[in-house]
C-alpha cells in the first residue's frame, strides 16, 4: 500500500499516484474531495493528514470505503470515545499502545481505568506471571482519530503495585514532588533530534542507496528538493502535536541530511517527560503511515556526519531571577562532580556520538562554556549578559529517557550537595567562582 499527504499541495511522502478519484485530462488522477482529515472537517482544522492508498485500481472501492471509515467523526452518534493507552516497552525506548472504549469523554487521567497487557510479549515480565498494569498519567487529544478521542500516557506496574524496571516515570515523579524541587519550578526545553530512514534499505531519507550525499554544510535549516528530505513528515508532526496539546515550540532541518529536530517546552517538572513521549509516539505513527522508518540512534551513520542528540535546556526559579548566573555556575559545578552518573543515564550508544567532534564534547571529559557547542554544558550569551537564565546540557543522546534526564538534572542541582572539599577542587578545575 501507499500513502499520500492529504493537503492542498501535490505529491507526498511515498508514492505519487492517487487511484480512486478517477482521471482528469491527460490521464492525471482527479483531486479527491476535501472531506475530513483525522475525523475533523478540513474547514474546521487546517492540518495535514495521511491518506491510505492502493497500489492498483482493482482495489480502489475498498480503499475508498476504508478511508471513509478512518475519517469518520463518531461524535454526533455516540458519547463513547476511543482511548489509546501508550507505554514504554522492554527496550526502554520502544513504544507500545492499544485501544479501548471509554463510556464518555474525560478531562483527567484519574477518570480512566487501569488496564493490563502481556508483559511477556514486550520483554517486561515472565510468561508464567505476565500481567503488567497500566496506570494512566497524562492525556492528549488524538490527532489521528479526532473528536473527543484521546492518547493516554501510562506508566507500568506489577499487579502488586510496584513499578517495573522500565518505569522511569515513577522515580521522576518522586523527585519532582519533593518540596525543594517544586519550590524551584524547574523548566525544561528539550531538543529532540531524529533521523528518517528508507524502510527497505535502512539508509537515510534522501541519500542515494549505497552511496552518500555531498558533505555537510548545505542541509541545516535548508530549503530545496536537493537539500531537504522529509519536510512533510516534520510539518505533519508539528501540526499534530499542536492539535494534541503538546508544548511543541519549533522544528528545523538538521546538519545531516535526512535528520530533523523539534523542540518541546518550556515544560514544568514531570510534564517534560510526558510531552516528549507523547510527541515521539505521534512521530512514530506518522512515519508508519508514510512508509518511512524513524530512528533515534545517536549516531546512525558513522564517519564525518553529525550524530543525533536530545539537548536539554534547564532552569530553576533561582536561575531565572536576578543573580541567577551564580546559581547556574553552582549547578554546573554539581553536574561536573556527577558527570559519570549522568553519562550512564543519558542514552544507549552515546559513546559513538560524544567524540569531541561534530558539535559534541568528549564523553570522558566534563566541560562548560559560553556559546560553545563543543562543551558538555553550554550557557547562552544572553544568559551571561543578563546575569540570569538557563543552561543547556548537550550530553543526552536522542534515545534518552526524558523522565530520567530531567529528574537527574533536578536531583543533582537542587537536592544533592557535594562535600566542601570536592566542591573546591571542582571549582578550581573548571575556573568557577561560586
UniProtKB/Swiss-Prot annotation:
- Keyword annotations of the record: ATP-binding, Chloroplast, Ligase, Nucleotide-binding, Plastid, Transit peptide
GO cellular component: a single term: chloroplast
Q: Which EC number(s) does the record attach to this protein?
A: 6.3.1.2
What are the residue boundaries of the GS beta-grasp domain, all occurrences included?
A: 81-161
Domain GS catalytic span(s) in chain numbering = 168-434
Q: Which GO terms describe its molecular function?
A: ATP binding; glutamine synthetase activity
Task: Specify the transit peptide boundaries.
Answer: 1-54
Span list, region Disordered: 1-33, 101-126
Question: Where is the protein situated, by its record's location annotation?
Answer: Plastid, Chloroplast
Q: Which reaction does it catalyse?
A: L-glutamate + NH4(+) + ATP = L-glutamine + ADP + phosphate + H(+)
**PANTHER family assigned:** GLUTAMINE SYNTHETASE, GLUTAMINE SYNTHETASE, CHLOROPLASTIC_MITOCHONDRIAL
Which function does this protein serve? The light-modulated chloroplast enzyme, encoded by a nuclear gene and expressed primarily in leaves, is responsible for the reassimilation of the ammonia generated by photorespiration.
Similarity comment: Belongs to the glutamine synthetase family.
Record note on quaternary structure: Homooctamer.
**What is the name of the protein in this document?**
Glutamine synthetase leaf isozyme, chloroplastic
Species of origin: Hordeum vulgare (Barley)
Amino acid at each position: 500500500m501507499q500513502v499520500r499527504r492529504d493537503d492542498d499541495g501535490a505529491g507526498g511522502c511515498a508514492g505519487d499516484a492517487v487511484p480512486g478519484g478517477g482521471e482528469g485530462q491527460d490521464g492525471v488522477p482527479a483531486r479527491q474531495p476535501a472531506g475530513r482529515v483525522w475525523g475533523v472537517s478540513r474547514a474546521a482544522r487546517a492540518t495535514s493528514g495521511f491518506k491510505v492508498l492502493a497500489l492498483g485500481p482493482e482495489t480502489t472501492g475498498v480503499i475508498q470505503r476504508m478511508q471513509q471509515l478512518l475519517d469518520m467523526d463518531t461524535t454526533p452518534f455516540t458519547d463513547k470515545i476511543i482511548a489509546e493507552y501508550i507505554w514504554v516497552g522492554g527496550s526502554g525506548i520502544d513504544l507500545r499502545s492499544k485501544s479501548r472504549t471509554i463510556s464518555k469523554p474525560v478531562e483527567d487521567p484519574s477518570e480512566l481505568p487501569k488496564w493490563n497487557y502481556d508483559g511477556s510479549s514486550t520483554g517486561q515480565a515472565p510468561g508464567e506471571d505476565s500481567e503488567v498494569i497500566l496506570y494512566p498519567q497524562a492525556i492528549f487529544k488524538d490527532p489521528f482519530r479526532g473528536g473527543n478521542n484521546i492518547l493516554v500516557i501510562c506508566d507500568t506496574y506489577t499487579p502488586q503495585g510496584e513499578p517495573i524496571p522500565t518505569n522511569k516515570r515513577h522515580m521522576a515523579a518522586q523527585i519532582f514532588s519533593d518540596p525543594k524541587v517544586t519550590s524551584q519550578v524547574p523548566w525544561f526545553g528539550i531538543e529532540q533530534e531524529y533521523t528518517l530512514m528508507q524502510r527497505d534499505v535502512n539508509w537515510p531519507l534522501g541519500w542515494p542507496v549505497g552511496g552518500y550525499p555531498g558533505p555537510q554544510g548545505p542541509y541545516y535549516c535548508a530549503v530545496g528538493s536537493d537539500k531537504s528530505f522529509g519536510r512533510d513528515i516534520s510539518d505533519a508532526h508539528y501540526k499534530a502535536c499542536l492539535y494534541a496539546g503538546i508544548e511543541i515550540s519549533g522544528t528545523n532541518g538538521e546538519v545531516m541530511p535526512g535528520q530533523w529536530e523539534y523542540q518541546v517546552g518550556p515544560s514544568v517538572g514531570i510534564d517534560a517527560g510526558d510531552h516528549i513521549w507523547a510527541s515521539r509516539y505521534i512521530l512514530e505513527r506518522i512515519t508508519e503511515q508514510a512508509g518511512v522508518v524513524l530512528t533515534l540512534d545517536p549516531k546512525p551513520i558513522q564517519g564525518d556526519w553529525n550524530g543525533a542528540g536530545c539537548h536539554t535546556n534547564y532552569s530553576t526559579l533561582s536561575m531565572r531571577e536576578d543573580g541567577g548566573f551564580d546559581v547556574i555556575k553552582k549547578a554546573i559545578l554539581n553536574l561536573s562532580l556527577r558527570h559519570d552518573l549522568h553519562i550512564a543515564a543519558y542514552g544507549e550508544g552515546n559513546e559513538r556520538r560524544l567524540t569531541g567532534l561534530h558539535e559534541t564534547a568528549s564523553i570522558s571529559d566534563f566541560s562548560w562554556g559560553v556559546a560553545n557547542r563543543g562543551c558538555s554544558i553550554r550557557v547562552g550569551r544572553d544568559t551571561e549578559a543578563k546575569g540570569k537564565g538557563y543552561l543547556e546540557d548537550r550530553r543526552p543522546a536522542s534515545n534518552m529517557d526524558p523522565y530520567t534526564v530531567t529528574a537527574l538534572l533536578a536531583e543533582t542541582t537542587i537536592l544533592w550537595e557535594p562535600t566542601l572539599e570536592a566542591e573546591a577542587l571542582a571549582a578550581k578545575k573548571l575556573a568557577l567562582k561560586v
